[in-house]
């Protein structure tokens, strides 16, 4: 496995692979890897070569968010990648990604102003900009992203279509702890009491998905049922609960098809997200 920090060197390796007609699966991460990331690596191994990038992108964090405290453990991440058959770990620093006087950004006028985008201004501008750069540097065939960041997946798919990138976005299922909590690098922030309280998030998601699959169409009723679960936990502060069309991120009143149910909530000071996706409803 190659551990690369230079943009120039990464591009040269990719160029060599492509000259031998090798396909590339790419998993973008911010590090502090967990089983959710490793499941993406497993999917990516259907390609000839697998690249994992590790970059805590300052551009996608707001001024009062957790950029400086975001968990980091490069040595552990590199070992996990090696143990799971990754071919290249690309670990650029901010000076490699954003040169002096950097002034070019990728933004989107729709989809990004809802859900997490509404709560985190500028977040998706940072995501789209950095992924555009990674796509140009690494030239992947398929990019593997987790459904836990569902809005991000939809935003990036739209960006790929709009900008004619020659690649495919593959959305992979949420990976959960044994008790149901969605795997997240930020789970490490939780105290014992907060960890216990956080289960209300996944419980609200499971209930809502069950209601949808059983035929409930009224989103107000589903949202209220989710609120009832979350509001029982004093350590939880709801950021949003939304049921939206998965393709447009627009709120829906009556469920027809492709519904995404999404929750963001603070457990203590830690903001966690979770969701369910139901497609193919008649």
UniProtKB/Swiss-Prot annotation:
Keywords: ATP-binding, Cytoplasm, Ligase, Nucleotide-binding, Pantothenate biosynthesis
Record protein name field: Pantothenate synthetase
Function: Catalyzes the condensation of pantoate with beta-alanine in an ATP-dependent reaction via a pantoyl-adenylate intermediate.
UniProt record similarity statement: Belongs to the pantothenate synthetase family.
Additional comment: The reaction proceeds by a bi uni uni bi ping pong mechanism.
A Pfam short name: Pantoate_ligase
InterPro entries in alphabetical order: Pantoate_ligase (IPR003721), Pantoate_ligase_C (IPR042176), Rossmann-like_a/b/a_fold (IPR014729)
One BP annotation, GO: pantothenate biosynthetic process
Subunit structure, interactors included: Homodimer.
Gene Ontology molecular-function annotations: ATP binding; pantoate-beta-alanine ligase activity
Recorded metabolic or biological pathway in which this protein acts: Cofactor biosynthesis; (R)-pantothenate biosynthesis; (R)-pantothenate from (R)-pantoate and beta-alanine: step 1/1
Source species, domain of life: Bacteria
Active site: 37
Cellular component annotations (GO), alphabetically ordered: cytosol
Binding site for ATP: 30-37, 146-149, 175, 183-186
Locations listed in the record: Cytoplasm
Binding positions ((R)-pantoate): 60, 152
Protein's gene: panC
Record lineage: Bacteria, Pseudomonadati, Campylobacterota, Epsilonproteobacteria, Campylobacterales
Keyword presence, Coiled coil: no
The species this protein was found in: Campylobacter jejuni subsp. jejuni serotype O:2 (strain ATCC 700819 / NCTC 11168)
Reaction it catalyzes: (R)-pantoate + beta-alanine + ATP = (R)-pantothenate + AMP + diphosphate + H(+)
């Amino acid at each position: 496995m190659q551990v690369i920090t230079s943009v120039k060197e990464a591009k040269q390796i990719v160029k060599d692979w492509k000259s031998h007609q090798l396909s590339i699966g790419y998993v973008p991460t911010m590090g502090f890897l967990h089983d959710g990331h490793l499941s993406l690596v497993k999917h990516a191994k259907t390609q000839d070569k697998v690249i994992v990038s590790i970059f805590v992108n300052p551009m996608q964090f707001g001024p009062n968010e957790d950029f400086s405290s975001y968990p980091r453990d490069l040595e552990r991440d590199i070992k996990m990648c090696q143990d799971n058959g990754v071919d290249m770990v690309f670990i650029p620093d901010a000076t490699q990604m954003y040169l002096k006087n950097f002034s070019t950004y990728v933004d989107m006028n729709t989809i990004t102003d809802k859900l997490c985008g509404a709560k985190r201004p500028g977040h998706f501008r940072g995501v789209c900009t950095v992924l555009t750069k990674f796509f140009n540097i690494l030239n992947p065939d398929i990019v593997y992203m987790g459904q836990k960041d569902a809005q991000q997946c939809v935003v990036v798919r739209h960006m790929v279509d709009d900008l004619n990138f020659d690649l495919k976005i593959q959305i992979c299922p949420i990976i959960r702890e044994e008790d149901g909590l969605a795997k997240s690098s930020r789970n490490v922030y939780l105290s014992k009491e907060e960890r216990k309280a956080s289960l209300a998030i996944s419980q609200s998601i499971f209930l809502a998905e069950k209601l949808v699959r059983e035929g409930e169409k009224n989103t107000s009723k589903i949202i209220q049922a989710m609120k009832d679960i979350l509001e029982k936990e004093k350590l939880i502060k709801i950021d949003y609960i939304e049921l939206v069309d998965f393709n447009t991120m627009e709120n829906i009143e009556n469920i027809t098809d492709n519904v995404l149910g999404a929750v963001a909530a603070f457990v203590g000071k830690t903001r966690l997200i979770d969701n369910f996706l139901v497609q193919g409803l008649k």
